[in-house]
Amino acid sequence: MNTYKNSLNHFLNLVDCLEKIPNVGKKSAFKMAYHLGLENPYLALKITHALENALENLKTCSSCNALSESEVCEICSDESRQNSQLCMVLHPRDVFILEDLKDFLGRYYVLNSIEEVDFNALEKRLIEENIKEIIFAFPPTLANDSLMLYIEDKLQHFHLTFTKIAQGVPTGVNFENIDSVSLSRAFNSRIKA
């Protein structure tokens, strides 16, 4: 026997897809699908077009691994930024969050994962940009502390100053879950790593 829900395969597929977005539960996914499918199909088409454009044009910067729509991102190509400081972050979204604070005017390096770090390219960049300080802007965890020590060890021959953002960022919490005042205070109170 066919049930009502079985007759709505496309709609339920949309709900399932939306539910896969982080922090979106079944009820929220249903509300979004209903709104996009019935109440505002024009918005659904705009979102579809925006997604297509983002997927076609979004890439990572060849210099710092941040999100970019060109080979080199705006931050790396901005000659007015300070070359002496390199802020290491774990994810491209962390660059967005730190840039919104407007507290850091240097350059970035997005790790993504330690396995992906091209230390030869990173060392070349340290020399070319005359980097004097590496700022670790990682959420405080034991794993991230180990990661900082590993990077310091790999780059010790450059005699850099290694600092990390101050505690005040709760342990185990991602940047997007921290208010901007706390994150700004922690960033400006960074300490030697």
From Swiss-Prot:
Superkingdom of origin: Bacteria
Disulfide bonds: none
Domain annotation Toprim: ranges: 84-170
Protein's UniProt keywords contain Cell membrane: no
InterPro entries, sorted: DNA_Rcmb_RecR, Rcmb_RecR, Rcmb_RecR_Znf, TOPRIM_dom, TOPRIM_RecR
Gene3D superfamilies, alphabetized: 3.30.60.80, 3.40.1360.10, RecR Domain 1
GO molecular function: DNA binding; zinc ion binding
Coiled coil region boundaries: none
Function summary: May play a role in DNA repair. It seems to be involved in an RecBC-independent recombinational process of DNA repair. It may act with RecF and RecO.
Name this protein carries in UniProt: Recombination protein RecR
